């Protein structure tokens, strides 16, 4: 018999129903469950697939550069970044009538185009790219790296080049390599690029391969470096009247600590950014020499962990046994990596708008909104993934004997206390926040807005004041004008910081009031509830009072029959599934808050947010309804306009989202019956009955239908909000 899909599971390949296809797709990447898998092959497969992943990333970024060079208006944008709209790529659509062609022909293009809201123009401009030729060169280089990655992936699947398991488990060497080699050397290389290409570019000096050996990045060259007079590199920075990309008002400094923003570009000083990357490079280069490898010097991570027993015995045997537990569990390592990456992605969202690093990006409001929302959603998915793999670790990899009384075992021992505390925090936040919002709603409905309960966020205001914000009048730390820190800050370190904090046109330490206080606690409710579901799912993954032998059922079982008092919806997968809804809900609140506050800031009517955000009707009416008018007007009696694509996407997003419920709120028997009826009709219909299928059609399993429903819900939810966000922002600010 010919090999049927899936080849990795002979059991599934012989399944006579359509379950074969769906289960095959679902388990294609679960290498551990494949036939004749060994630990060695498992590691080698994952390693090789990393190169494929890199190849895709390089190909994708190469495509961005290529399409902008070919169909964009980068060179025109460089001449006037604030008024030319950056083009992502052309649109060729045979359905376009004349009104559509006219609506989408913008940015000086000859035909219909898409506008770029990704910030790539600002990024490329900041790092020194100026011409289409530069973009093509970058695209070709990335294409080359993509091909190289594919070759490397193929190479490491050949018998001679397959690394051994011991190589994969050599944690110290890997850590040294990643810290020094990846983070250290790449940060140093980036500093080099900024100093040699980007900073001269910002001063009107065009540095390329033909002249980069002749153009000194600093008038004194490496003299100050070797003589130890490093402060010379910080002298004579760009002046506040510097015009970015020209020599007008420029200085000669390359590594500075100015703080604050370049007055014209509203972005961080490039010389500060170079200084930052140099510091990071030194830190990581040192960190990458700390662990013991072939040379017998440095720390052994196992020794560090074994020795780390907290005093007083309150954490039992501390970190004993953790080294082998982590080093032998891919799921534990993936969980740690995802948790770290998730936090970093969310931090990127927060910092890209509050401390913009790219020239003129702060004045491109739609891009700011798109980037913030994009990074927050990505962070949410990555963080939920961390807990999912944490749960799989407990089911597949956790060994109680190896971890007796260490911090991991004690987490499991104390899980009731952890879960109940999280539950209490979620209930407290939910009832109090909703109570305040609803009270305020009722007061407005009855025409007595003065009876609202409005709480000033005094602790948060105090923290902002401590960092230098003077408008609250707290007179503490950096906002205390006669304190030593304030006076040192004016001259020695970051003189621009205090100006930036108190400048109301940027997004650094936005002024906050009662509306912020309420939405902060609404978001805290969402975060705590999401965490509760995820933590409970992971800590109960091996077993609970109701189902002590849960680990024997694997990660994603739907139910264990009618006994035991009801064992449906309690698998670790079910917890992940529920948590994703809460994650989306929470990030919805986060992005609503960010977007509304910024729209009012950019429009200069901050009082609208302050007055309307203290009650739910304000959010529904003055944020969602008021800002959806652009979408509703995408198509109107006068024809269409450039927002119509977002109007269409808004409707399509709702359709996808609503389709999710068809899978989420429906029992399996209904679908099975429907499918059998359809199959029966098909087999008895002339012509149609000439086409037969090999697999008997069966309904999706409960878990699969939930996954399909969750995927539609998530994708539709994000599509809908993306269209709303981009249309409402670009409709106002262009």
Curated annotation (Swiss-Prot):
<feature type="binding site" description="axial binding residue">
    <location>
        <position position="662"/>
    </location>
    <ligand>
        <name>chlorophyll a B3</name>
    </ligand>
</feature>
<dbReference type="InterPro" id="IPR036408">
    <property type="entry name" value="PSI_PsaA/B_sf"/>
</dbReference>
<dbReference type="Pfam" id="PF00223">
    <property type="entry name" value="PsaA_PsaB"/>
</dbReference>
<comment type="function">
    <text>PsaA and PsaB bind P700, the primary electron donor of photosystem I (PSI), as well as the electron acceptors A0, A1 and FX. PSI is a plastocyanin-ferredoxin oxidoreductase, converting photonic excitation into a charge separation, which transfers an electron from the donor P700 chlorophyll pair to the spectroscopically characterized acceptors A0, A1, FX, FA and FB in turn. Oxidized P700 is reduced on the lumenal side of the thylakoid membrane by plastocyanin.</text>
</comment>
<feature type="binding site" description="axial binding residue">
    <location>
        <position position="654"/>
    </location>
    <ligand>
        <name>chlorophyll a B1</name>
    </ligand>
</feature>
<keyword id="KW-0479">Metal-binding</keyword>
<protein>
    <recommendedName>
        <fullName>Photosystem I P700 chlorophyll a apoprotein A2</fullName>
        <ecNumber>1.97.1.12</ecNumber>
    </recommendedName>
</protein>
<comment type="similarity">
    <text>Belongs to the PsaA/PsaB family.</text>
</comment>
<feature type="binding site">
    <location>
        <position position="670"/>
    </location>
    <ligand>
        <name>chlorophyll a B3</name>
    </ligand>
</feature>
<feature type="binding site">
    <location>
        <position position="559"/>
    </location>
    <ligand>
        <name>[4Fe-4S] cluster</name>
    </ligand>
</feature>
<keyword id="KW-0150">Chloroplast</keyword>
<feature type="transmembrane region" description="Helical; Name=VI">
    <location>
        <begin position="369"/>
        <end position="395"/>
    </location>
</feature>
<feature type="transmembrane region" description="Helical; Name=I">
    <location>
        <begin position="46"/>
        <end position="69"/>
    </location>
</feature>
<dbReference type="InterPro" id="IPR020586">
    <property type="entry name" value="PSI_PsaA/B_CS"/>
</dbReference>
<dbReference type="GO" id="GO:0016168">
    <property type="term" value="F:chlorophyll binding"/>
</dbReference>
<dbReference type="GO" id="GO:0009535">
    <property type="term" value="C:chloroplast thylakoid membrane"/>
</dbReference>
<keyword id="KW-0157">Chromophore</keyword>
<keyword id="KW-0004">4Fe-4S</keyword>
<keyword id="KW-0603">Photosystem I</keyword>
<keyword id="KW-0148">Chlorophyll</keyword>
<feature type="transmembrane region" description="Helical; Name=X">
    <location>
        <begin position="643"/>
        <end position="665"/>
    </location>
</feature>
<keyword id="KW-0812">Transmembrane</keyword>
<dbReference type="GO" id="GO:0015979">
    <property type="term" value="P:photosynthesis"/>
</dbReference>
<keyword id="KW-0560">Oxidoreductase</keyword>
<keyword id="KW-0460">Magnesium</keyword>
<feature type="transmembrane region" description="Helical; Name=IV">
    <location>
        <begin position="273"/>
        <end position="291"/>
    </location>
</feature>
<feature type="transmembrane region" description="Helical; Name=III">
    <location>
        <begin position="175"/>
        <end position="199"/>
    </location>
</feature>
<dbReference type="InterPro" id="IPR001280">
    <property type="entry name" value="PSI_PsaA/B"/>
</dbReference>
<dbReference type="GO" id="GO:0051539">
    <property type="term" value="F:4 iron, 4 sulfur cluster binding"/>
</dbReference>
<dbReference type="GO" id="GO:0009055">
    <property type="term" value="F:electron transfer activity"/>
</dbReference>
<feature type="transmembrane region" description="Helical; Name=VII">
    <location>
        <begin position="417"/>
        <end position="439"/>
    </location>
</feature>
<dbReference type="GO" id="GO:0009522">
    <property type="term" value="C:photosystem I"/>
</dbReference>
<feature type="binding site">
    <location>
        <position position="568"/>
    </location>
    <ligand>
        <name>[4Fe-4S] cluster</name>
    </ligand>
</feature>
<feature type="transmembrane region" description="Helical; Name=VIII">
    <location>
        <begin position="517"/>
        <end position="535"/>
    </location>
</feature>
<keyword id="KW-0793">Thylakoid</keyword>
<dbReference type="GO" id="GO:0016491">
    <property type="term" value="F:oxidoreductase activity"/>
</dbReference>
<feature type="transmembrane region" description="Helical; Name=V">
    <location>
        <begin position="330"/>
        <end position="353"/>
    </location>
</feature>
<keyword id="KW-1133">Transmembrane helix</keyword>
<feature type="transmembrane region" description="Helical; Name=IX">
    <location>
        <begin position="575"/>
        <end position="596"/>
    </location>
</feature>
<keyword id="KW-0934">Plastid</keyword>
<comment type="subunit">
    <text>The PsaA/B heterodimer binds the P700 chlorophyll special pair and subsequent electron acceptors. PSI consists of a core antenna complex that captures photons, and an electron transfer chain that converts photonic excitation into a charge separation. The eukaryotic PSI reaction center is composed of at least 11 subunits.</text>
</comment>
<feature type="transmembrane region" description="Helical; Name=II">
    <location>
        <begin position="135"/>
        <end position="158"/>
    </location>
</feature>
